[in-house]
Amino acid sequence: EQVAVRMIHAAGMVGLEDHIRFSPGFVPAARAALDSGAPILCDARMVSEGITRPRLPAGNAVVCTLQDAGVPELAAKMGNTRSAAALERWRPHLAGAVVAIGNAPTALFHLLNMLEDPACPRPAAIIGCPVGFVGAMESKDALWADQPGSRAQTPSHFRRARPDSPGQLAPPPIRYFRWLRSP
């Protein structure tokens, strides 16, 4: 409940409460990770700047690798966005971390692709709230469908606005999507 209240306060939207989903065990897993000093990995500086550091229980590191040297070159090599490429820099910190995706759908897609590899370290909790009209719904659906364990998100059917006009944004190239496995 406290998490939802903080989300409502941050967004300034009282009606947000009906549009938040938590997996069973999300809050205890995230709390335990934070209490143990786990880092918080953020996809964008805007997300990291929104974290009130004095409230962190163990002086947790807040990590955003988007501006790191070499990320633009890695993105070009990967054929993906800087947001997705920056997540590759998370690997040494990912085990037991709290992940906060609050900007780029491509970052959430890339995280899910990384987690398909059994050798990839697993975070303790994933918060998936990417924004925008291109890929945000699909990335949240993929998080909810494919990641057992602890996660929270604003669901894919919730948007503050809709691009219903002709000339709305086209879907992203297929390389940004993580297609769900066949049943």
Segments the model singles out, each with a brief description of its role:
Residues 10-18, 72-73, 125:
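Short, basic, glycine/proline-bearing loop/turn elements
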Residues 18-33:
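A short, well-structured juxtamembrane/interface segment
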Residues 32-36, 90-95, 119-121:
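Flexible, charged surface loops at secondary-structure boundaries
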Residues 43, 127-128, 167:
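Buried hydrophobic positions in well-ordered alpha/beta secondary-structure cores of metabolic enzymes
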Residues 44-114, 124, 132, 140:
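Conserved mixed alpha/beta catalytic, RNA-binding, or beta-rich assembly cores of soluble enzyme
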